[in-house]
Amino acid sequence: LEQAKVLRYGENPHQKAALYGNFFDCFEQLQGKELSFNNIIDITAATYLIGEFQKPTVAILKHTNPCGVASDENLVIAWEKAFATDKQAPFGGIIVVNQTVDKAFAEIVSSIFSEVIIAPSFTDEALAIFGKKKNLRLMIANGSLPADSLREVRSVIGGLLLQDRDM
């Protein structure tokens, strides 16, 4: 794997970190601050989670843990259901959807502080609303995941473990 980017720091500010591989082939950042180590981990977890759903779905994650997930006929209703599960945990979290983010969704979601919003696309009206939040990271998920993303790698003493993802 080639180094793609040196990160400001790792999971904690005293840790050095770098990103290796083709992460940025899978996502396009439209706005916001530079991605952190923790953002990249959360984006990965969010992307795997949302890939399990066909209907319009919203998932809210914090530290890779889903704190609200719902599917419905549209993203606004799905958001209301996902957010209702825990109205405090989403603060500073990651929001991922599997449909285009439109004005109605952007207006509702922009009322809380989020670190990252991931979607297949955003309408111009949604981008204008989110554009007022300069630090909010907006990410477009560029279609399907590469085949090497379907494997999990864990470091262990003296080596690595590699396994297929549990789909």
Task: Specify the residue positions occupied by each region the protein language model found.
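ATP-dependent carboxylate/acyl-activation modules
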Residues: 1-167
